[in-house]
């Protein structure tokens, strides 16, 4: 729904790894499934999510070399010759449109079957599932294939894991695209002091209000323009703060 629930400034001499725990502390996560970019695949972050009675689905890349190596090796062996005898779940979706076919396939393995093959298993609180997601995009003149690996605290349900990974990228694309198109965020040159964070906060508040206002049958960009020249509509937008 493109709502922004929280925001934390990343210090100039730091990165998102230190900012994410601060953000998790201020959010009510109970009962939710949390997805984060690969930088957020950290044992401390996974522990915080579980401690708040939530679940996680986290991408595993080479910033976690042992974890990435073990998971990729497990799925490679399963794909080639079933050297490791592990039950797994699988789910596939096929979408057609805009001149292409997108096939997404997910395989998941439950912890009871992989924990002896994962050297860092005990470091990840709540870890129940490892997953491999393959995205195949078929265009008129070429085929693109991308493979990603994940750890998850949810049970080994390939459909649920695949849905979580798709939802994550949907939020990324919709939110960032709207902020860029409707608010021209990428063109902002505000750098001094807390200016960048302050303006980002204002953009997020405005986006939340415009997203919640449902009477105007147009996109966020046009809603923003309408609020600028129509005071009656502006009051409708502001009334969504309640």
PLM region spans:
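Short amphipathic alpha-helical "interface-anchor" segments enriched in bulky aromatics
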Residues: 155-190
């Amino acid at each position: 729904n493109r709502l922004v629930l929280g925001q934390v400034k990343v210090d100039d001499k730091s990165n998102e790894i230190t900012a994410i725990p601060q953000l998790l502390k201020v959010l009510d996560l109970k009962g939710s499934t949390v997805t984060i970019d690969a930088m957020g695949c950290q044992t401390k972050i996974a522990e915080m999510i579980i401690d708040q009675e939530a679940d996680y689905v986290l991408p595993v890349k080479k910033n976690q070399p042992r974890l990435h190596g073990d998971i990729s090796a497990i799925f490679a062996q399963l794909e080639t010759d079933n050297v490791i005898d592990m039950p797994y779940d699988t789910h596939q979706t096929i979408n057609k449109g805009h001149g292409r076919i997108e096939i997404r396939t997910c395989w998941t393995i439950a912890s009871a079957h992989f924990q002896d093959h994962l050297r860092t298993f005990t470091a990840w609180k709540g870890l129940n599932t490892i997953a491999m997601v393959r995205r195949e995009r078929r265009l008129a003149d070429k085929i693109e294939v991308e493979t990603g690996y994940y750890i998850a605290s949810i049970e080994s349900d390939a459909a649920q894991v695949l849905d979580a990974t798709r939802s994550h990228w949907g939020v990324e694309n919709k939110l960032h695209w709207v902020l860029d198109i409707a608010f021209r965020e990428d063109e902002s040159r505000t750098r001094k002091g807390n200016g960048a964070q302050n303006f980002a906060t204002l953009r997020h508040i405005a986006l939340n209000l415009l997203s919640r206002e449902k009477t105007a049958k147009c996109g966020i960009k046009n809603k923003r323009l309408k609020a600028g020249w129509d005071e009656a509509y502006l009051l409708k937008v502001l009334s969504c703060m309640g």
